[in-house]
Amino acid sequence: MPELAKSAPAPKKGSKKAVTKAQKKDGKKRKRSRKESYSIYVYKVLKQVHPDTGISSKAMGIMNSFVNDIFERIANEASRLAHYNKRSTITSREIQTSVRLLLPGELAKHAVSEGTKAVTKYTSAK
């Protein structure tokens, strides 16, 4: 009696394995494109602030959108400032001014001090 060819069980609806196992016509596995996000950094900060607290994937998506939005706003404002001052380079000074313009009061002060601290740490590590 001939053996029947064993086939892999059909993936469940919505299964992520179905996407990873997708094959091209020549038999090679297709690489999944990487999605860049700030999720690992958001998670690290969360653990520094609240070590026993978790975050849902929906909340992480919202945080990722928030960081992307703020990044874009700061970059646009810094670009505008550089253009006004006839500069072709965005420096930490433009970023700092953009943060002061975009964020309200106390939040701007904290952001500027944390940013200054990060730049100092970066330059001293060189």
Swiss-Prot record:
Modified residues (N6-butyryllysine): K6, K21
Glycosylated residues, chain numbering: S113
N6-methyllysine sites (modified residues): K47, K109
Pfam families: Histone
Modified residues annotated as N6-(beta-hydroxybutyryl)lysine in this record: K6, K12, K21, K35, K109, K117
Modified residues (ADP-ribosylserine): S7
Role according to the record: Core component of nucleosome. Nucleosomes wrap and compact DNA into chromatin, limiting DNA accessibility to the cellular machineries which require DNA as a template. Histones thereby play a central role in transcription regulation, DNA repair, DNA replication and chromosomal stability. DNA accessibility is regulated via a complex set of post-translational modifications of histones, also called histone code, and nucleosome remodeling.
The protein's name: Histone H2B type 2-E
Organism of derivation: Mus musculus
